[in-house]
Curated annotation (Swiss-Prot):
Keyword Nucleus: no
Source organism per UniProt: Homo sapiens (Human)
Subcellular location(s) of the protein: Cytoplasm; Cell projection, Cilium, Flagellum; Cell projection, Cilium; Cytoplasm, Cytoskeleton
One cellular component (GO) term of this entry: motile cilium
Function: Component of the nexin-dynein regulatory complex (N-DRC), a key regulator of ciliary/flagellar motility which maintains the alignment and integrity of the distal axoneme and regulates microtubule sliding in motile axonemes. Binds calmodulin when cellular Ca(2+) levels are low and thereby contributes to the regulation of calcium and calmodulin-dependent protein kinase IV (CAMK4) activity; contributes to the regulation of CAMK4 signaling cascades. Required for normal axoneme assembly in sperm flagella, normal sperm tail formation and for male fertility.
Pfam families: IQ
GO process terms (BP): cilium organization; sperm axoneme assembly; spermatid development
Keywords: Calmodulin-binding, Cell projection, Cilium, Cytoplasm, Cytoskeleton, Differentiation, Flagellum, Spermatogenesis
Name this protein carries in UniProt: Dynein regulatory complex protein 9
Length: 443
């Protein structure tokens, strides 16, 4: 899976790193292990390196160049002493062809580069993808041969020899190229910027590789969850298909019942329609006979009405002539009566005018008499009021005189003064008389 990630990243073989190797021991992994939590990978943190450095001194350049040349020689020796087996060569050849094919059509061969690492249970599960590979001609034949060779060897031995040797060769070639470029740069400009750039690029590739591993783990989990969802969806689909089949069978039964019912209804409707047509035909024949008789009656009635119409027309003409004569008579009489009534109306108008003048004179006389009567009444009212006033004044004067006379007598004023000698003898009588007078006044 590591090489698949590198090949998917479209990186050249020179930048593949060699710090992570794959070793498979024991039985192939199961789905339980894939569902577990992925193991944490130690990430080497490389400090930031400046892009440019100051040129080195000549002794340093010579010393470093000697060390690097010695390293290059050792790597070359390692290339010649490394054992290369047949399986390794064939795997490298197949890998190079797979890379070329993936460069042209990456989507059609997603599993070709990982076939040497896929265990047998996983290969059987991904069997539907193999027809896409076999149709590619000669490569498919070689692929099958290589697959047979791989499956004949133990899993640990095959994967370790092939993958490890390939990685060692790639790393050795990469280090040789980097060291050669560094030696050349030291000899030219006394700097080693190419080495720093290679390290920086390798660090970026390494981080990218870790990202690819994380995405691959996430993809595996998503695939497992999607497989579970697919199983659930298949179960639901099968249940739905079963229910739909039952529903279809029920509908078929209903359709058969409806067909039988419709056949019975069609027969009944056909018989009913034939009977209705026969009855309607009889009714139409009977109605036609009645209409013929009615037409004959109407023809005879029309002839009779035409004769009657002629007689009525002659009668109406005679009556019209009589009415015209009577109309002329009445018009003459109307003129005479109108003239006579007009004369009477004129006489009545003259009489009305004379009566109106007489009535106006009478109204004027009546108004004058009314005025005289009103004035007489007013005068009588005044005289009555005056008489009443005089009587009241007379009564008031009499009362006033009586009151004054009594006052003079009581107080002995004027001619009513009594002599002194008679006062003593007649004291008692005087008192009695005074009381009587007072009583009389009160009365």
């Amino acid at each position: 899976m590591e090489e698949d990630s590198l090949e998917d990243s479209n990186l050249p073989p020179k930048v593949w790193h060699s710090e992570m190797t794959v070793s498979v021991t024991g039985e192939p992994p199961s789905t339980v292990e894939e569902e577990g939590i992925p193991k944490e990978t130690d990430i080497e943190i490389i400090p930031e390196i400046p892009e440019t450095l100051e040129p080195l001194s000549l002794p340093d350049v010579l010393r470093i160049s000697a060390v690097l040349e010695d390293t290059t020689d050792q790597l070359s020796i390692l290339n010649y002493i490394m054992p290369v087996q047949y399986e390794g060569r064939q795997s490298i050849c197949v890998k190079s062809r797979e890379m070329n094919l993936e460069g042209t059509n990456l989507d059609k061969l997603p599993m070709a580069s990982t076939i040497t690492k896929i265990p047998s249970p996983l290969i059987t599960e991904e069997g539907p993808n193999l027809p896409e590979i076999r149709h590619r001609g000669r490569f498919a034949v070689e692929f099958n041969k290589m697959q047979d060779l791989v499956f004949k060897k133990p899993t640990r031995q095959t994967i370790m020899t092939t993958e490890t040797l390939k990685k060692i060769q790639i790393d050795r070639q990469f280090f040789s190229d980097v060291i050669a470029d560094t030696i050349k740069e030291l000899q030219d400009s006394a700097t080693y910027n190419s080495l720093l750039q290679a390290l920086s690029k390798e660090r970026e590739n390494k981080m990218h590789f870790y990202d690819i591993i994380a995405r691959e783990e996430k993809g595996r989990k998503q695939i497992i969850s999607l497989q579970k969802q697919l199983i659930n969806v298949k179960k639901e689909w099968q249940f739905e298909v079963q229910s739909q089949n039952e529903y279809i069978a029920n509908l078929k039964d209903q359709l058969q019942e409806m067909k039988a019912k419709s056949n019975l209804e069609n027969r009944y409707m056909k018989t009913n329609t034939e009977l209705q047509i026969a009855q309607t035909q009889k009714k139409c024949n009977r109605t036609e006979e009645l209409l013929v008789e009615e037409i004959e009656k109407l023809r005879m009635k029309t002839e009779e009405e035409a004769r009657t119409h002629t007689e009525i027309e002659m009668f109406l003409r005679k009556e019209q002539q009589k009415l015209e004569e009577r109309l002329e008579f009445w018009m003459e009489k109307y003129d005479k009566d109108t003239e006579m009534k007009q004369n009477e109306l004129n006489a009545l108008k003259a009489t009305k005018a004379s009566d109106l003048a007489h009535l106006q004179d009478l109204a004027k006389m009546i108004r004058e008499y009314e005025q005289v009567i009103i004035e007489d009444r007013i005068e009588k009212e005044r005289s009555k009021k005056k008489v009443k006033q005089d009587l009241l004044e007379l009564k008031s004067v009499i009362k006033l005189q009586a009151w004054w006379r009594g006052t003079m007598i009581r107080r002995e004023i004027g001619g009513f003064k009594m002599p002194k000698d008679k006062v003593d003898s007649k004291d008692s009588k005087g008192k009695g008389k005074g009381k009587d007078k007072r009583r009389g006044k009160k009365k």
